[in-house]
């Protein structure tokens, strides 16, 4: 298990390929992102790689992507979410010595953390910016563990999801007893998950 796993998913299959000649690597996350930005931005623009800058492992993920983008003619800016402001729905960097316009955004920062930023931070700009963005906030609806609760209302068939995902219920719908796993609607790395049979009385 690695943070994001973007570098590993892009590089490790190619390292392993000589040992498994019957298989061929498929996909390259960094290249796919690059190609998407190439369709929406001009050459040489600056891409902001937004992440939780206090976490070295998050920086490692962004550094991999930033290096790849720079190798292909872009300029990289490593930023915390509150390092960007918005002017006429365009992202602008506030970083000292790196001030100015930003041509694209790759966000590797949990959306539900944005409201915890300083009250002076205009994090709402991430929602309606015209700056080309990867991991747009609208995707949070699909990230929520509560999405299966509204599938029928949305009129979606989703045969693979329905076949593979265990039954999902809202906790407020009642007590379900043993055999259920309780998860926060939004979360990562297993935090906040509760399995009744595995909990100690203190927990």
Annotate each PLM feature.
Residues 3-203:
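Domain-scale recognition of functional cores that engage charged ligands
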